[in-house]
Amino acid sequence: MAHSVRIYDTCIGCTQCVRACPTDVLEMIPWDGCKANQIASAPRTEDCVGCKRCESACPTDFLSIRVYLGSETTRSMGLAY
């Protein structure tokens, strides 16, 4: 079952989510929008197992990364904003 991984612009570039992911779905890429000059990216979502460890590791007040399981609808994804 496919999962959708969304990275939001509240990402502070701390790498906590990348280190927490057991399947290496996430990686850091260059980005000028934060102090760390990097942001999380999810280039391998097909490997996501839906464990949501990345969400648990995120230190921002509003989770900068969200995993939407295959059973969740596109509508519920839109409500996350």
Curated annotation (Swiss-Prot):
<dbReference type="GO" id="GO:0009773">
    <property type="term" value="P:photosynthetic electron transport in photosystem I"/>
</dbReference>
<dbReference type="InterPro" id="IPR050157">
    <property type="entry name" value="PSI_iron-sulfur_center"/>
</dbReference>
<keyword id="KW-0934">Plastid</keyword>
<keyword id="KW-0411">Iron-sulfur</keyword>
<keyword id="KW-0603">Photosystem I</keyword>
<feature type="binding site">
    <location>
        <position position="17"/>
    </location>
    <ligand>
        <name>[4Fe-4S] cluster 1</name>
    </ligand>
</feature>
<keyword id="KW-0249">Electron transport</keyword>
<dbReference type="InterPro" id="IPR017491">
    <property type="entry name" value="PSI_PsaC"/>
</dbReference>
<keyword id="KW-0150">Chloroplast</keyword>
<keyword id="KW-0677">Repeat</keyword>
<protein>
    <recommendedName>
        <fullName>Photosystem I iron-sulfur center</fullName>
        <ecNumber>1.97.1.12</ecNumber>
    </recommendedName>
</protein>
<dbReference type="GO" id="GO:0009535">
    <property type="term" value="C:chloroplast thylakoid membrane"/>
</dbReference>
<keyword id="KW-0472">Membrane</keyword>
<keyword id="KW-0813">Transport</keyword>
<feature type="binding site">
    <location>
        <position position="21"/>
    </location>
    <ligand>
        <name>[4Fe-4S] cluster 2</name>
    </ligand>
</feature>
<keyword id="KW-0408">Iron</keyword>
<keyword id="KW-0560">Oxidoreductase</keyword>
<dbReference type="GO" id="GO:0016491">
    <property type="term" value="F:oxidoreductase activity"/>
</dbReference>
<dbReference type="InterPro" id="IPR017896">
    <property type="entry name" value="4Fe4S_Fe-S-bd"/>
</dbReference>
<keyword id="KW-0602">Photosynthesis</keyword>
<dbReference type="GO" id="GO:0009055">
    <property type="term" value="F:electron transfer activity"/>
</dbReference>
<feature type="binding site">
    <location>
        <position position="51"/>
    </location>
    <ligand>
        <name>[4Fe-4S] cluster 2</name>
    </ligand>
</feature>
<comment type="subunit">
    <text>The eukaryotic PSI reaction center is composed of at least 11 subunits.</text>
</comment>
<feature type="binding site">
    <location>
        <position position="11"/>
    </location>
    <ligand>
        <name>[4Fe-4S] cluster 1</name>
    </ligand>
</feature>
<dbReference type="GO" id="GO:0009522">
    <property type="term" value="C:photosystem I"/>
</dbReference>
<dbReference type="InterPro" id="IPR017900">
    <property type="entry name" value="4Fe4S_Fe_S_CS"/>
</dbReference>
<feature type="domain" description="4Fe-4S ferredoxin-type 1">
    <location>
        <begin position="2"/>
        <end position="31"/>
    </location>
</feature>
<feature type="binding site">
    <location>
        <position position="14"/>
    </location>
    <ligand>
        <name>[4Fe-4S] cluster 1</name>
    </ligand>
</feature>
<dbReference type="GO" id="GO:0046872">
    <property type="term" value="F:metal ion binding"/>
</dbReference>
<keyword id="KW-0479">Metal-binding</keyword>
<feature type="binding site">
    <location>
        <position position="54"/>
    </location>
    <ligand>
        <name>[4Fe-4S] cluster 2</name>
    </ligand>
</feature>
<feature type="binding site">
    <location>
        <position position="48"/>
    </location>
    <ligand>
        <name>[4Fe-4S] cluster 2</name>
    </ligand>
</feature>
<feature type="domain" description="4Fe-4S ferredoxin-type 2">
    <location>
        <begin position="39"/>
        <end position="68"/>
    </location>
</feature>
<comment type="function">
    <text>Apoprotein for the two 4Fe-4S centers FA and FB of photosystem I (PSI); essential for photochemical activity. FB is the terminal electron acceptor of PSI, donating electrons to ferredoxin. The C-terminus interacts with PsaA/B/D and helps assemble the protein into the PSI complex. Required for binding of PsaD and PsaE to PSI. PSI is a plastocyanin-ferredoxin oxidoreductase, converting photonic excitation into a charge separation, which transfers an electron from the donor P700 chlorophyll pair to the spectroscopically characterized acceptors A0, A1, FX, FA and FB in turn.</text>
</comment>
<dbReference type="Pfam" id="PF14697">
    <property type="entry name" value="Fer4_21"/>
</dbReference>
<keyword id="KW-0004">4Fe-4S</keyword>
<feature type="binding site">
    <location>
        <position position="58"/>
    </location>
    <ligand>
        <name>[4Fe-4S] cluster 1</name>
    </ligand>
</feature>
<dbReference type="GO" id="GO:0051539">
    <property type="term" value="F:4 iron, 4 sulfur cluster binding"/>
</dbReference>
<keyword id="KW-0793">Thylakoid</keyword>
